[in-house]
Amino acid sequence: MIVIVMGVSGSGKTTVAALLAAKFGWRYREGDDLHPAANVEKMRGGTPLTDEDRWPWLRKIAEEIDGWRARGEDGVLTCSALKRAYRDIIIGDRPEVALVYLKGSQDLIARRMAARHEHFMPTALLASQFATLQEPTPDERPIVVDIGGAPGELADRVVRELQFRSRDSDAASRLRPGPQIP
């Protein structure tokens, strides 16, 4: 199983995804690390990315997912995945990929972003992310998690929902705590 943790910048993707990966002993990949340097510099400079900027990045994420699938590996990956078209690229017809949407108000997320200092994404771009955001629809089968709680509580909610959804599938045995994989 592969879990994509999505949401706007500052929603807690990195923290929740790392907790999920640690709980299951799965691989973890920060989607931001796959951005071309030009994208990072553009965002650092306060310029929102365009679709044309994002397509190569999204294809890299899809390639990462396909590599895990080819090797039979489970993993957790973060990606803002703001539009349905972006999610179609990274999830597509990959039935073993689950989508987790970390949902929160712009005000709450802006406060969180203001408190962090080591990330390239400035708070000034948050409004553009919310303007771009197309929330997942029921046909995408997202696990929607309100980000109002502590990160551990959010991760636990995701674990319970993944276990519930997978109770009758091959993935059920892989949704138990396991050893940490680098």
Predicted regions and their residues:
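Walker A (P-loop) ATP-phosphate-binding motif of ABC ATPase nucleotide-binding domains
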Residues: I2
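Conserved phosphate-donor/acceptor-positioning beta-strand/loop module used by diverse small-molecule
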Residues: D93-R112
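P-loop (Walker A) phosphate-binding loop of NTP-binding proteins
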Residues: V8
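Small-molecule kinase domains that catalyze NTP-dependent phosphoryl transfer to phosphate-bearing small molecules
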Residues: A115-R157, R165
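Hydrophobic anchor at the beta1->P-loop junction of P-loop NTPases
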Residues: V5
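Glycine-rich phosphate-binding loop used to anchor ATP phosphates in small-molecule kinases
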Residues: E52-R94, L102
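Conserved substrate/cofactor phosphate-moiety recognition/catalytic segment
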Residues: A18-K60
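Conserved lysine of the Walker
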Residues: K13
